[in-house]
């Protein structure tokens, strides 16, 4: 694997035998840089605003939305917090989205998943104004991504790209294996890696739950991006020496002392062979939140026709 140990703008590695890619540090640097972009927009008379809509009783979702609001406050983005009873009819959520679409003071809309069973997630995503779709999941934005003309990149894959760039990991010509085929991570990640752009130009193999002999694919990889949502499915025996491992998974598993968070990669054994690896937590997760801010700032710049530089 071609791995460059050059100091980058967002310094994120520690000089040990295996490089630990610190997403918390990179995300903090991006948030710091976004403040100047937000200030430039505010000086034109507009404050960027993100509206979040929560329609579930999941404590983890509630905590995650709260963290997003804290991030917004840090960089100067205003927020609007909307909570809908999970038992309410789907029409109430649809009407809320329609109202936010029509509100010119709202620049980004995020509907927190999961949604109740009686609400069609696809219809909700289609209903959001594509220019306010800061998750990047509207069919129009998905199409633009596939065409190589993205308006908003989905936050987790975009965050992974930023990590690869920050760690000076060479993707051009690399064999990259993406494990997982979700619309949120796996599919857009594979698309971004093959594009003619920074953190692109890789040769990509997509694997999933029906892939035969997964280990044979991962052992041939220069870069592994594990996003299947299966606790510790990848261990050191499944990777070759010198591989870069990006662990997207965040799974709560029961232990003798209660529970703990683990990734899709068994960290200890993988770290012994990897050139670089992300921790869980503290790797990809903070980057996902940072790129939501990034997309919201970009959405505001588009809405106000303001020229800004994004980190």
UniProtKB/Swiss-Prot annotation:
<comment type="similarity">
    <text>Belongs to the tetrahydrofolate dehydrogenase/cyclohydrolase family.</text>
</comment>
<keyword id="KW-0028">Amino-acid biosynthesis</keyword>
<feature type="binding site">
    <location>
        <position position="209"/>
    </location>
    <ligand>
        <name>NADP(+)</name>
    </ligand>
</feature>
<dbReference type="GO" id="GO:0004477">
    <property type="term" value="F:methenyltetrahydrofolate cyclohydrolase activity"/>
</dbReference>
<comment type="pathway">
    <text>One-carbon metabolism; tetrahydrofolate interconversion.</text>
</comment>
<keyword id="KW-0378">Hydrolase</keyword>
<dbReference type="Pfam" id="PF00763">
    <property type="entry name" value="THF_DHG_CYH"/>
</dbReference>
<keyword id="KW-0486">Methionine biosynthesis</keyword>
<dbReference type="InterPro" id="IPR020631">
    <property type="entry name" value="THF_DH/CycHdrlase_NAD-bd_dom"/>
</dbReference>
<dbReference type="InterPro" id="IPR000672">
    <property type="entry name" value="THF_DH/CycHdrlase"/>
</dbReference>
<dbReference type="InterPro" id="IPR046346">
    <property type="entry name" value="Aminoacid_DH-like_N_sf"/>
</dbReference>
<protein>
    <recommendedName>
        <fullName>Bifunctional protein FolD</fullName>
        <ecNumber>1.5.1.5</ecNumber>
        <ecNumber>3.5.4.9</ecNumber>
    </recommendedName>
</protein>
<dbReference type="GO" id="GO:0009086">
    <property type="term" value="P:methionine biosynthetic process"/>
</dbReference>
<dbReference type="Pfam" id="PF02882">
    <property type="entry name" value="THF_DHG_CYH_C"/>
</dbReference>
<keyword id="KW-0368">Histidine biosynthesis</keyword>
<dbReference type="GO" id="GO:0035999">
    <property type="term" value="P:tetrahydrofolate interconversion"/>
</dbReference>
<comment type="function">
    <text>Catalyzes the oxidation of 5,10-methylenetetrahydrofolate to 5,10-methenyltetrahydrofolate and then the hydrolysis of 5,10-methenyltetrahydrofolate to 10-formyltetrahydrofolate.</text>
</comment>
<dbReference type="GO" id="GO:0006164">
    <property type="term" value="P:purine nucleotide biosynthetic process"/>
</dbReference>
<comment type="subunit">
    <text>Homodimer.</text>
</comment>
<dbReference type="InterPro" id="IPR036291">
    <property type="entry name" value="NAD(P)-bd_dom_sf"/>
</dbReference>
<feature type="binding site">
    <location>
        <begin position="180"/>
        <end position="182"/>
    </location>
    <ligand>
        <name>NADP(+)</name>
    </ligand>
</feature>
<feature type="binding site">
    <location>
        <position position="250"/>
    </location>
    <ligand>
        <name>NADP(+)</name>
    </ligand>
</feature>
<dbReference type="GO" id="GO:0004488">
    <property type="term" value="F:methylenetetrahydrofolate dehydrogenase (NADP+) activity"/>
</dbReference>
<keyword id="KW-0511">Multifunctional enzyme</keyword>
<dbReference type="GO" id="GO:0000105">
    <property type="term" value="P:L-histidine biosynthetic process"/>
</dbReference>
<keyword id="KW-0658">Purine biosynthesis</keyword>
<dbReference type="GO" id="GO:0005829">
    <property type="term" value="C:cytosol"/>
</dbReference>
<keyword id="KW-0554">One-carbon metabolism</keyword>
<keyword id="KW-0560">Oxidoreductase</keyword>
<dbReference type="InterPro" id="IPR020630">
    <property type="entry name" value="THF_DH/CycHdrlase_cat_dom"/>
</dbReference>
<keyword id="KW-0521">NADP</keyword>
